[in-house]
């Protein structure tokens, strides 16, 4: 026995499916503007999200200055530039080795390549992938919501996601959270389109899990959550379970090689900063404290709360709307014993959200944008849950999210001044950078260009002083200690890529014993081919906040001088302090 249903992400296409398979949410077609939403929900989301993304792209080009990249951004952008530099049609394996040997998620830097190949070799060109990810993720959110509750909810969910504060700031930054969230959403969308893991979307589901796991190293923690969603969709269907196995094999085949090649460095980093002693440096508390912290972060990212205030009235509207929707579903069930078409899919997405929050709560490391892969699923789930609520409540909720979205865009595009009430209160880097140079403060934006110019010049001068000590064309090996946000091994690596020079930095853990630090003070090191070359030493001496491995930089500096290292160059820092460049006396 077969039945027919609408299986397409657009309307009007039907195909036979087994009676045990879940139908898509019913399609309703209205007239006028509502008819457009019903017939072409993805087109509406794509057009509006593209407009939002274009606005962010313009902001990136006009406001992201080279001296205003945080260390993670600088490192990721340097990776993208290095990927581009390694492209050689005569030696394609050089590109494979460069990408495959990258110790941080390579997917987003890889996706930046078309922009770097078509445009100038500028960090801002690499960042242009972020607005594209915004559009793709908005479509994926709409796709999930379409499967759960129909086209109108799809439009609402896609546009709410595209205008959230956390998404706006992630789009304007070159962090990897947006990439991880995009592929998490694409994976779930593919899962819901897979006819319970029986068609070709099954392979897309597995592929997107792999891409998520290679987008950001910590995102591998969300792979079990997406796998759990697959288990819920499969249910007791043996054919669906075979599809789940195939999706898993695709995921392992795609992500496995990169994880195996970099296994030691990836696991050492993840366990050290996720569950080791260093995790406590970025957050503490019991499991309950961590769950509350994550829920607060999610509230901030969705305009529903601030860190200390959960009294936002929209929370009540959301809760009452969802409750009225549940009442409506219960009423219909009592009447004719039917449940919503997207119920199994909704349970799958809900399971992924709960498992994702559990993964977040398993570590004390607060992280930045760790919650995005959860939020990207929570948005369509919440709006789908509210989609059958009372009409008046849905209108109020829609108006609230529209107002929040306009406000968010105004704030994030700097059309509205910074503030302390409704997020986003500042660009993601402003408050952090202001701890090192007050000119980066959100209330001193007129000084941003001058501040970034000073720090760009400082990074350039430090790296070029190093490069002058090395024969032209040779890699520049340096041990760098005293790292801080505005000048560090990653910012120097970015400058090296802009100068098209191979930079090989090492960062000693100065907190360790004198004996363990001594290996970073040997006069020589080796290049990638094992050849012995001179080691250079960079010491940043200042009174600013240091990175965790650099806390004992002054002890390390004294040890270096005692071991025969001599200062051969100095560069003053814009806010006080100095960068010393040293060579060992055996190499002078």
Where are these regions (language model features)?
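Membrane-proximal lumenal/periplasmic loop motifs of glycosylation machinery
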Residues: 62-74, 87-109, 124, 485
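Hydrophobic, aromatic-rich transmembrane alpha-helices
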Residues: 231, 307-343, 354-355, 394-398, ...
């Amino acid at each position: 026995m077969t039945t027919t249903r609408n299986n397409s992400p657009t309307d009007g296409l039907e195909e036979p499916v087994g009676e045990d398979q879940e139908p898509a949410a019913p399609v309703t077609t209205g007239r006028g503007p509502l008819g457009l939403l019903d017939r072409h929900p993805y087109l509406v989301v794509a057009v509006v999200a593209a407009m939002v993304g274009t606005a962010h792209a313009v902001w990136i080009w006009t406001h992201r200055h080279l001296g205003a990249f945080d260390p993670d951004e600088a490192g990721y952008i340097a990776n993208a530039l290095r990927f581009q530099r390694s492209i050689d049609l005569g030696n394609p394996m050089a590109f494979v080795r460069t990408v495959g040997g990258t110790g941080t998620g390579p997917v987003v830097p890889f996706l930046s390549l078309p922009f770097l190949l078509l445009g100038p070799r500028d960090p801002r060109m690499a960042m242009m992938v972020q607005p594209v990810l915004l559009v793709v993720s908005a479509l994926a959110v709409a796709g999930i919501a379409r499967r759960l509750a129909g086209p109108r909810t799809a439009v609402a969910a896609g546009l709410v996601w595209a205008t959230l504060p956390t998404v706006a700031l992630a789009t304007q930054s070159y962090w990897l959270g947006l990439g991880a969230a995009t592929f998490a959403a694409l994976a779930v969308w593919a899962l819901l389109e897979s006819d319970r893991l029986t068609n070709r979307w099954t392979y897309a589901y597995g592929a997107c899990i792999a891409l998520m796991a290679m987008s950001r190293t910590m995102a591998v923690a969300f792979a079990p959550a997406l796998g759990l969603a697959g288990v819920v969709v499969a249910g007791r269907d043996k054919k669906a379970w075979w599809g789940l196995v195939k999706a898993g094999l695709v995921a392992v085949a795609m992500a496995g090689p990169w994880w195996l090649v970099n296994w030691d460095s990836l696991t050492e980093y993840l366990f050290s900063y996720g569950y080791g002693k260093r995790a406590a440096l970025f957050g503490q508390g019991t499991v309950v404290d961590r769950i509350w912290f994550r829920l607060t972060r999610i509230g901030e990212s969705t305009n529903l709360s601030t860190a200390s205030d959960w009294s936002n009235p929209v929370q009540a509207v959301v809760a009452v709307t969802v409750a009225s929707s549940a009442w409506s579903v219960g009423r219909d069930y009592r009447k004719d014993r039917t449940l919503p078409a997207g119920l199994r899919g909704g349970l799958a997405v809900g399971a992924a959200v709960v498992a994702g929050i559990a993964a977040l709560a398993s570590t004390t490391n607060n992280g930045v944008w760790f919650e995005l892969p959860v939020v990207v699923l929570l948005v369509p789930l919440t709006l789908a849950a509210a989609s059958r609520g009372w009409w008046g409540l849905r209108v109020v909720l829609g108006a609230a999210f529209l107002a929040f979205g306009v406000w968010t865009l105004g704030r994030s595009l700097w059309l509205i001044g910074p503030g302390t009430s409704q997020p986003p209160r500042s660009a993601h880097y402003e408050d952090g950078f202001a701890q090192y140079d007050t000119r980066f403060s959100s209330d001193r934006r007129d000084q941003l260009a001058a501040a970034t110019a000073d720090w760009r010049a400082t990074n350039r001068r430090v790296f070029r002083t190093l490069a002058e000590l090395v024969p032209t064309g040779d890699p520049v090996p340096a041990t760098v200690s005293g790292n801080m946000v505005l000048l560090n091994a990653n910012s120097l690596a970015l400058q090296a890529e802009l100068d098209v020079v191979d930079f090989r930095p090492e960062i000693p853990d100065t907190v360790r014993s004198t004996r363990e630090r001594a290996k970073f003070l040997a006069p020589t090191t080796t290049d990638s081919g094992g050849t012995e070359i001179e080691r250079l030493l960079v010491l940043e001496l200042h009174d600013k906040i240091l990175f965790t491995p650099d806390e004992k930089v002054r002890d390390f500096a004294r040890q270096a001088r005692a071991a025969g290292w001599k200062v051969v160059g100095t560069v003053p820092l814009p806010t006080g302090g100095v960068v010393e460049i040293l060579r060992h006396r055996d190499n002078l």
